[in-house]
Amino acid sequence: MFKAFKEFAFRGNVIDLAVGVILGAAFSGIIKSLVDSIFMPLIGIIIGGIDVKGLSVEVGNANLLYGQFLQASIEFILIAFALFLFVKGINAFRRKEETTEEVAAPTTEEKLLTEIRDALVRQQNERMK
């Protein structure tokens, strides 16, 4: 049982996922700070000096804080866009890596097979003459 768990836990995909979650959490904090400290104050200035996070509406005894929802929505959009750009960059890098691997010099086996093919073609051409 322990051996199976160890194989599962230390496979590349699980470790990659763990690193991704940790980096995602750290990145989320950076984006939250960017939105809270820079974007929302700028949006507040643009719409007339209003603190966007404090926007709310009272409905009966309830206070609906739609400003906080707006701020969280902007954070989500920025995080999603940044992750989109990151994944797009990674995919472009992988495609570039794959093309360089495809262009790599032929192996010894491939060279030998090419020579054999060429020799067979020459033999066939000589027989037809």
Swiss-Prot record:
One of its GO terms (cellular component) is plasma membrane. Its main location: membrane. The chain crosses the membrane at residues 8-28, 30-50, 67-87. The keyword Transmembrane helix applies. The keyword Transmembrane applies. One of its GO terms (molecular function) is mechanosensitive monoatomic ion channel activity. Keywords: Cell membrane, Ion channel, Ion transport, Membrane, Transmembrane, Transmembrane helix, Transport. PROSITE patterns: MSCL (PS01327). It is a multi-pass membrane protein. It is found in: Cell membrane. Channel that opens in response to stretch forces in the membrane lipid bilayer. May participate in the regulation of osmotic pressure changes within the cell. Belongs to the MscL family. Homopentamer. HAMAP family: MscL (MF_00115). This is Large-conductance mechanosensitive channel. The lineage of its organism: Bacteria, Bacillati, Bacillota, Bacilli, Bacillales. The gene is mscL.
